[in-house]
Amino acid sequence: MSRKISKESKKVNISSSLESEDISLETTVPTDDISSSEEREGKVRITRQLIERKELLHNIQLLKIELSQKTMMIDNLKVDYLTKIEELEEKLNDALHQKQLLTLRLDNQLAFQQKDASKYQELMKQEMETILLRQKQLEETNLQLREKAGDVRRNLRDFELTEEQYIKLKAFPEDQLSIPEYVSVRFYELVNPLRKEICELQVKKNILAEELSTNKNQLKQLTETYEEDRKNYSEVQIRCQRLALELADTKQLIQQGDYRQENYDKVKSERDALEQEVIELRRKHEILEASHMIQTKERSELSKEVVTLEQTVTLLQKDKEYLNRQNMELSVRCAHEEDRLERLQAQLEESKKAREEMYEKYVASRDHYKTEYENKLHDELEQIRLKTNQEIDQLRNASREMYERENRNLREARDNAVAEKERAVMAEKDALEKHDQLLDRYRELQLSTESKVTEFLHQSKLKSFESERVQLLQEETARNLTQCQLECEKYQKKLEVLTKEFYSLQASSEKRITELQAQNSEHQARLDIYEKLEKELDEIIMQTAEIENEDEAERVLFSYGYGANVPTTAKRRLKQSVHLARRVLQLEKQNSLILKDLEHRKDQVTQLSQELDRANSLLNQTQQPYRYLIESVRQRDSKIDSLTESIAQLEKDVSNLNKEKSALLQTKNQMALDLEQLLNHREELAAMKQILVKMHSKHSENSLLLTKTEPKHVTENQKSKTLNVPKEHEDNIFTPKPTLFTKKEAPEWSKKQKMKT
């Protein structure tokens, strides 16, 4: 609004100055013909008109000065804007040049990339062709390998060998063997030791089962004897206690009569004093217990607080480390931001300095133009004064000529003034339009600068928001990290506890394993001895079974100590006899089968001989080429028959092997279950071990001593595990407890016995 008012005032001043200039032009016109009668009136008019004219001239000169100043300002603005326009044009030219360079670079890069792409496509095509060729080759090799695998599968149906076949094949080197022969050899090498082991394990299992049954029977007998002895011992102990109590009661009754009479008063006073002491001690005890409870509670609370404080200290240490890391990171960021801020401040100071320099230049130019204007004004005023003085003189001299000239030239002057006024108005309008255009440009530039400033402010706000968001994310991550650290510590503690438990369990298990291994080694040594004895007996019996004469068989048996006290069982003898009977039956079956095979083979031989005769007769009758074909067909038929028979036999063998394998697996699983059951019955085995040791050490003694000593040892072991028996009961020697003289009444059972007596 202030700018608009100043513009309007300037317009008014300019118009007034132009009007005054027109008037001054009218007054300056000289007059030649003036009458003498109007001289006095003309003097008065001339003086007024001169004053007005001088004022108008002064105003016009002021307006001219202002107009010159404004023109100078406009010229300066034009120069500034022209320089800015030139700079912008230079920037535009630079940008266009850069654009052209970038387009050229882009075209070059596109050309290079197209060349590279074409080369890469060619390489890919070549690689694809090579890959396809390789794929075809691999497919062909795959088909060949599949055919070979099919042949190998067909050949690998029957790979079970006898010992003779294995020995024959083993004699050949591995390179000369075919794949099915090599596989059958390897299968025999792997399966044969397993079969032997299974047989041995079955034998061991049977032996252990027999021993277990015998040990169980012995254990039952020993437990029965132990229970009987324990019952007898408890009855004797109860009787002894009753007798000791009766003796103590009788002694008390004897001594009470004399003692009460002599020391009744002393005992009563002592009792009262002791009762008072007991009451005081109880009070003190209650007070101390209460204080002890309070102290224990305080101690537990303090221990809890100490634990919590230790946890807080550890957490604070970790927080401190984390905060130190964050502080270091933030300090680095702060240093970067400070460097950036210093750069921006330096740029801002440079811009301020440039602004101040421009302002100083503007002020200096304004002062310079002001001084020049004042000097010009002073010179013009002096010139005006001189002119006014000269004109006054001229007016005094030519006052008469004034009115005539004025009257003559008034109309012409008016016309000229109007024309000049119109010209001035047009010039003013042009100047105002240019001024408005410049103002519009100035405003546009100002708006563009303001928009840029707002954009920069908006960017700074966005960056501040992003920094706040990053800080929030950092805080959340810090919280999550602390929680994770706490969980880690908990899991570490749990892991330490579990590792301690694991090590303790491992140590206990190792101890137990060593004990069991020692026991197992002892049992194994004994079992080996028994097995050797039984094997010797089996060999002797088998030798006697092979001998046909009974007398010679009895001699062999007696020579090896038959009839002596060899530690064998009835079950073992039954097994041996059953084994011999089975062998006899097997031999009979084999004999009958061999006879049947012989008869069948004889029949086959007769049939084949007949067929051979017929075929030979036919062949002799036929011509040569047909004979050759028939022989080839016969050979093929014979080969086919032999191959089919061998295939059938091999399939049967495979099925038998599968059955044997399943049976062996079942026996293996059963043995594993039996072993687990035996391991579960460790306590029974330990007791059996002790019994066997005692039996071995005291084998020469009588059976009565064994029955007495063994329950003692068993009872001692069980007492050491379960009960803590006092020393008075050791070695069946009872030492009664010391008698205590009390003022209590006798028990009821002693009173009843007294009443009965």
Swiss-Prot record:
Region ranges (Required for interaction with PCM1): 271-363
Effect of residue 637 to A: In JBTS33; loss of function in ciliogenesis
Subcellular location, principal: cytoplasm
Intracellular or extracellular location(s): Cytoplasm, Cytoskeleton, Microtubule organizing center, Centrosome; Cytoplasm; Secreted
Induction text: By progesterone.
Region (Sufficient for NK inhibitory function): 1-184
UniProt region (Mediates modulation of Th2 dominant cytokine production), positions on chain: 1-419
Subunit structure: Isoform 1 interacts with PCM1, BBS4 and CEP63. Interacts with IL4R. Interacts with CFAP53.
Protein name according to UniProt: Progesterone-induced-blocking factor 1
Organism taxonomic ancestry: Eukaryota, Metazoa, Chordata, Craniata, Vertebrata
